A protein has these predicted regions:
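Conserved, structured C-terminal
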Residues: 1-190
Length: 190
């Protein structure tokens, strides 16, 4: 992930530049065989790599020969995805929080968004197509907490004037880019 992702990976697979965003292909050289997709979870250009367990250490060593590659952990990934407004399954999107409620209707192809007999077949279509047509009760929003402490998953959100609970934080953390805490939450649309 990041501005040098293609440069780093092209040291191992020269044809990686042919891979467009959201495309994937199997690729091999004399040392490695991988399934690579051009996608990511940080808001940056990047690649997802599936490789045999036996090859992981050698593959990683080859990657780390590039001067621009730096290891990061899940904390960095999480702050980047929060800054980009990307959902984490299990937090911002669950079996109970549908794509329309998570502001992800765009991920459902337009041809599948019509309530027709041919579209009755994907999991959750009865609920999801009804929400697309009639609206949702809850929506996902970005939040800037007051103060320096991040609002964490499960924190309750209250309307400031009435004191009525209107939602729940689904993800939260500190944004290094903004130098402040940020969160996403699910609030009552009313």
């Amino acid at each position: 992930q990041g501005p040098f992702a293609q440069d780093v990976l092209s040291n191992i697979f020269t044809e990686i530049s042919k891979l467009n965003f959201l495309d994937s292909f199997e690729i091999s050289n004399q040392d490695f065989s991988c399934l690579i997709s051009r996608s990511g979870y940080t808001g940056e250009d990047g690649f997802e790599i599936s490789i045999r367990n036996d090859d992981v250490a050698n593959f990683a060593n080859e990657l780390f020969k590039h001067k621009h590659l730096k290891p990061i952990g899940l904390g960095a990934r999480d702050s980047l995805r929060l800054e980009a407004g990307l959902c984490l399954y299990g937090n911002d999107l669950t079996k109970e929080i549908t794509p329309p409620e998570a502001a992800l209707t765009w991920t459902i192809h337009k041809s599948r968004q019509n309530n027709t007999p041919s579209n009755k077949g994907f999991l959750g279509s009865d609920i999801i197509l009804n929400q697309i047509k009639n609206g949702v009760k809850y929506i996902r929003v970005g939040l800037f907490p007051i103060g320096k402490a991040p609002m964490r998953q499960g924190s309750e959100i209250y309307q400031s004037k009435s004191g009525v609970k209107i939602g729940t934080v689904t993800s939260g953390g500190f944004s290094p880019t903004l130098n402040r805490p940020i969160s996403m939450g699910r609030i009552d649309k009313a």
